[in-house]
Amino acid sequence: ALKVAGGAKTGAAEWVALDMDQVQISARVAAAAVGATQFCRPEDLERIAATLYVALTCEDVDNAANTSGRGAVMAVELDDEPTVKYVAAAGKNAPIEIQPNVATGAAGVTGFKGADNLADGPDGKLWIVEDNAFSDIWVLDPQSGDANDDGYPDGMHLFASLKDKPAEGTGIYFGKDPHTLYVNVQHSGTGNDKTMAITRQHKGNNQGNSNTTTAVQGH
């Protein structure tokens, strides 16, 4: 289990062994017994090179006691002496989501909320899909700059949003073709759960490229 020094959530850390007999009964009890650090709903892991990324669906990066946060992605550097830091969070390197106000007509803001599933992109970027309504797909470039020196990479961008509000994008991954991203859609408001392939379309004749989306399986 991961244990961050000094009872903090970020910084120097260590891996501590668990009582495997207790793990078979309750992994949470086993982790608590060795003082492992608690995070809010770690939903998915993705390793890129020597960094392990973790989607924390309800993490609050500013208030460790809050279990209803907007979510975040953290990175664990897998060195002999591991370190932990947050790399994606609303209000840091992504907008805070604001729902549109029907009464006033005020427009909403598409923000980052409920990080849920992760994928390693072909160029080393981290792809993130939300458990949110509406569910969005974001792309984080871990190697991008940090202009305000807050520890969060500046290269965090919105890639796509589902129009089906109840639906949840999940199971995001790249196949053998580095230009094709697969996204599973569940809990669709239309009852049409599906797997979608988002592919770069090469137009030729110097007309550039565009993204196309195809449902490769559904019901």
Language model features by range: what are they?
Residues 1-219:
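Sequence/structural signature of beta-propeller domains
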